[in-house]
């Protein structure tokens, strides 16, 4: 990477953040990493009709972890096509991203979404149909439980797509470390845990990918025929529920509930800290 390339990258970094604290943290993070004038603005990315996104607002690459689990007011929903309107923020952000990279021949995106995006039908199915008709959804990275704890315990995934014809969809199941069922604020996910996935990825062109106990591929036609269901079981991982006793299942359920209670307590302490 040359100095000129780094300068060009810094000059073309853009972002939008609605809430004041994440906005401040994002600005500080960029400054600390050498970006002298961060192109981050405060505002709602969904506040403008997607049909009116200007040329200057269109980009080549989007990396985003938008909020999900919330709802947008009706005035914001009206910024989207009638047949694709929904209150769920995850679907609105996905549409917004698609509109921003659609006209770029090299447009590509990595976006964090909740599990519901994978199996939703109705409006969600229509949005996924549009996604797979305009882009190549090439990878679904299934994250372990509790990656964003204590802020949310909703299971999450990362969708990777690019401008181009839809090909096979690869799924990669990222396991939690041995002996761990969930992550916590004090024991978060570490960058090193992506090492196996990075080695499997195959570089920019995603060459030499192979199926293994964590990765499998699905042709687009079965996905279309299923109503665009992406919540697919790993065929290389047998369903061990059939081979476990009711006593074992109940014990695991109790352990899971205890972990969830601890996450809620951590979140309660976080909220109390912000209130001070």
Residue ranges and their predicted role:
Residues 18-56:
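S-adenosyl-L-methionine
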Residues 42, 47-49, 54-276:
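A conserved structural/catalytic subdomain of Rossmann-like adenosyl-cofactor enzymes
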Residues 13-17:
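Conserved SAM-binding motif I beta-strand of class I
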Residues 7-11:
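Extended, gly/pro-poor, charged amphipathic helical "stalk/hinge" elements that serve as dimerization
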Residues 1-5:
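Conserved SAM-binding loop of SAM-dependent methyltransferases across substrates and taxa
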């Amino acid at each position: 990477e040359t100095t000129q390339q780094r300068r060009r990258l810094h000059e073309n970094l853009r972002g939008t953040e609605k809430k004041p604290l994440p906005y401040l943290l994002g600005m500080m993070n960029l400054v600390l990493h050498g970006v002298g004038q961060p192109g981050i603005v405060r505002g709602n990315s969904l506040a403008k009709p997607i049909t009116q996104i200007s040329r200057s607002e269109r980009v080549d690459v989007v990396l985003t972890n938008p909020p999900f689990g919330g709802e947008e007011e009706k005035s914001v929903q009206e910024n989207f096509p009638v047949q694709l309107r929904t209150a769920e923020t995850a679907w609105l952000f996905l549409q917004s991203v698609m509109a921003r990279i659609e006209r770029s021949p090299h447009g590509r995106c990595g976006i964090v979404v909740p599990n519901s995006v994978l199996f939703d039908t109705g409006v969600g199915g229509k949005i996924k149909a549009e996604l797979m008709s305009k882009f190549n959804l090439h990878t679904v990275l299934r994250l372990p439980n509790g990656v964003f704890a204590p802020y949310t315990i909703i299971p999450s995934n990362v969708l990777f797509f690019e401008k181009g014809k839809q090909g096979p969809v690869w799924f990669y199941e990222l396991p939690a470390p041995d002996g761990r069922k969930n992550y916590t604020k004090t024991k978060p996910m570490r960058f090193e845990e992506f090492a196996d996935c990075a080695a499997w990825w195959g570089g920019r062109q995603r060459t030499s990918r192979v199926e293994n106990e964590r990765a499998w591929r699905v042709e687009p036609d079965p996905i279309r025929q299923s109503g665009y269901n992406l919540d697919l079981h790993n065929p290389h991982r047998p369903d061990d529920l059939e081979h476990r006793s009711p006593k074992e299942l109940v014990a695991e359920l109790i352990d899971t509930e205890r972990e969830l209670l601890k996450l809620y307590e951590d979140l309660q302490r976080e909220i109390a800290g912000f209130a001070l």
